Design a protein with these regions (language model features):
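...captures the hydrophobic TM-helix bundle architecture rather than a specific catalytic motif
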Residues: 1-167
Length: 167
């Protein structure tokens, strides 16, 4: 799992590096495009994912002390918050589409959709992994699932300021 996590972090790192490299060529255009984003909903999504990471870590601690039922509840809480993240992100995409904003609108939005879409796919994969782990709840399995989930959290904590806040 660690090889997968490190390789995924490298892929996201390359995407962020490309975003920042292209941003240097058109800072005004990127800033103008960025004004179309909802910083508040992205901030809420940040809180949602960090909280879900807490529940994933709690699940490991609970399972390690023999409390499997509570551990499963913590995993389902992390999964539910992952679903909340995806609902908010989908709303954001639908709203952008309604404004006619696509990957072709500006290079900023090409990167926005690619990076956040790839991340959303990882959130979905993480929800599936946490679901599988909940059925085979051992400390080792939960630790593995939580490690992937924390990678998803970490990526968002990097994407959020770079895409939504950095000017």
């Amino acid at each position: 799992m660690w090889v997968l996590i490190i390789s995924e972090l490298l892929v996201f790192g390359a995407g962020l590096a490309a975003f920042l490299s292209v941003r240097i060529t058109d800072p005004a255009g990127f800033a103008e495009a960025q004004d179309h984003l909802h910083r508040v909903s992205a901030g809420i999504n940040t809180i949602v994912l960090i909280t879900s990471g807490y529940f994933a870590a709690l699940a490991y601690r609970l399972c390690s002390t023999g409390r499997k039922k509570q551990s499963r509840f913590a995993l389902f809480s992390a999964m539910a918050l992952g679903c909340v993240f995806l609902v908010i992100k989908t709303w954001e995409y639908v709203e952008k589409a309604g404004q006619g904003i696509t990957t072709e609108t500006h290079p900023f939005f090409t990167f926005y959709y690619l990076l956040t879409g790839f991340h959303a796919a990882h959130v979905l994969a993480g929800i599936v992994i946490l679901g599988l782990v909940s059925f085979f709840a051992t400390p080792r399995n939960i630790e593995t699932g939580a490690a992937f989930w924390h990678m998803v959290d970490l990526v968002w904590v990097l994407l959020f300021p770079v895409i939504y806040l950095l000017r």
